[in-house]
UniProtKB/Swiss-Prot annotation:
Name of the gene this protein is made from: cobQ
CDD domains assigned: GATase1_CobQ
Active site (UniProt): 331, 428
Stated name of the protein: Cobyric acid synthase
Transmembrane segments: none
Keyword annotations of the record: Cobalamin biosynthesis, Glutamine amidotransferase
Function: Catalyzes amidations at positions B, D, E, and G on adenosylcobyrinic A,C-diamide. NH(2) groups are provided by glutamine, and one molecule of ATP is hydrogenolyzed for each amidation.
One Pfam family in the UniProt entry: CbiA
Length: 482
């Protein structure tokens, strides 16, 4: 039976996901069969698994780091926010409900069984299970019926290492404060801590490090400097969307929708040396000198159509198009480009019909059945293969479908306007296909690099593991697992 170790954080976006990925690669290189696990995740950035379900994108990256296929057991409970107070609840890869926050709180006790079932199945297949927590165990208001952090750790008897983010400031108060506010039995599960995202000379933090050890009685496993190549790895949280710019390069803009989903579609583009990827934030105008505007996926197509219009982006898009610019809509963005989006059954919210942007002559009707599959398609314009996945509800049809974006099993997929400058597709992950990406950028007169995307991700994972091995007591961490 496998051993297990849990990585929890002093807060969100402290680096838990990347540390688990780096440890997974490091321990896999030692010859261990490592499997990642996150009991509960909240993300609209999902990956399609080999068993036909969906999990958080971070667990898919961790699986890649461990050299295994992603599986629904790696993330048994996935919450996909649709509004500020409600989310789709996905269990073992399949949607079971849409619940408001209080409704979900009432569901959690019944979900612990599903979490433990998945955990036990992974343990039966692994030498080591690396568990990632969610948010912070310091949120004691959520401790009752918790399945994500200490509730799981104690039920499954998994030791915990806590990650603190020094880049935000206040890391001493974060870690010492957690020891102060959580239940003593929960605190006893924490065996140590790691300081993450340090910039500069780590010896300057020696006194702070010793103070944390003294105040908490937890063992320190090291100070991890800022990892410069983190931007080369897919990010799961919208917080991770980069504002890094490349002045003088060809601009591609992406709209930062309020319910943006599967934005890792952008990752291969941002790594292209000749592409200056601009995230257009709420309240900002779409720059007038971009060659392509991408409308990304959304967890709430009609809601984000209203959000898009509230920013004035509909007017900006029309101006961009009239100047000769190109537009690409992916999944929910594809639906928005059409003449209308109808939701007669209220799948995404109140039933109704919302006018689209009208840049494609298609209409979308939402339906309860969800398409969730990995696919191999062929780009219609260049005949290049595309390895991708679909994860959407709704069906789109109309005259512009006569000019498909791609062919999928011999059938048309997506739509293109009569002048070829507006394109829509349900294919996610399409830009990871190197030959297609190069052909697509070439048509926009943007030079593309030759380095394969997946090779770059693999290289970054190896570098992350090297970085962790150099700065943390990795053997000490492994010795904690039980």
């Amino acid at each position: 039976m496998a051993r297990a170790l849990m990585i929890q954080g002093a807060g969100s976006d402290v680096g838990k996901s990347l540390i688990v990925a780096g440890l997974a690669r490091a321990f896999t290189r030692r010859g261990l069969r490592v499997l990642p696990f996150k009991p509960q995740n909240m993300s609209n950035n999902a990956a399609v698994t080999v068993d036909g379900g969906e999990i958080g994108r971070a667990q898919a990256l961790q699986a890649l780091a461990a050299g295994v296929e992603p599986h629904t057991d790696m993330n048994p409970v996935l919450l996909k926010p649709e509004t500020d107070v409600g989310a789709q609840v996905v269990v073992h890869g399949k949607r079971i409900a849409t619940a408001r926050a209080r409704e979900y709180a009432a569901m959690k006790p019944s979900l612990m069984g599903a979490v433990l079932e998945s955990f036990e199945r992974l343990k039966a297949r692994a030498d080591l299970v690396l568990v990632e927590g969610a948010g912070s165990p310091a949120e004691v208001n959520l401790r009752k019926a918790d399945i994500a952090n200490m509730g799981f750790a104690r039920k499954a008897d998994v030791p915990v290492v806590l990650i603190g983010d020094i880049d935000r400031g206040g890391v001493i108060a974060q870690l010492v404060g957690i020891k102060t506010v959580i239940d003593p039995d929960d605190a006893a599960m924490i065996q140590g801590f790691v300081i993450n995202k340090f910039r500069g000379d780590p010896t300057l933090f020696d006194d702070g490090y010793k103070l944390i050890e003294a105040k908490t009685a937890w063992r320190g496993f090291g100070v991890l400097p800022w990892f410069a190549r983190a931007g080369e790895l897919p990010a799961e949280d919208a917080l991770g969307l980069s504002d890094a710019r490349k002045p003088g390069q060809c601009k591609i803009a992406c709209l930062a929708l309020s319910r943006i989903a599967n934005f890792d579609d952008l990752d291969p583009l941002k790594l292209e040396a000749a592409v200056d990827l601009v995230m257009v934030r709420p309240g900002e105008a779409i720059p007038g000198d971009v060659r392509l505007v991408i409308i990304p996926g959304s967890k709430s197509t009609r809601g984000d159509l209203a959000f898009l219009r509230a920013q004035g982006w509909d007017i900006d898009l029309l101006a961009h198009y009239r100047r000769g610019g190109h537009v690409l809509g992916l999944c929910g963005g594809y639906q928005m480009l059409g003449r209308s989006v109808a939701d007669p059954d209220g799948i995404e919210g109140p039933a109704g019909d919302t006018p689209g942007l009208g840049l494609l002559d298609v209409q979308t009707v939402m339906s309860p059945q969800k398409t969730l599959t990995r696919v191999t398609a062929v780009h219609a314009a260049t005949n290049q293969p595309i390895q991708a996945y679909e994860i959407h509800i709704g069906r789109t049809d109309g005259p512009d479908r006569a000019r498909p974006f791609a062919k999928l099993n011999g059938e048309p997929e997506g739509a293109i306007s009569s002048d070829g400058r507006v394109q829509g597709s349900y294919l996610h992950g399409l830009f990871t296909s190197d030959d297609f990406r190069k052909a697509f950028l070439t048509k926009l007169d943007i030079p593309a690099g030759d380095e394969p995307y997946h090779s770059r991700v693999e290289s970054a994972l190896d570098a992350l593991a090297d970085h962790i091995e150099k700065h943390l007591d990795v053997e000490g961490l492994l010795s904690l697992a039980r």
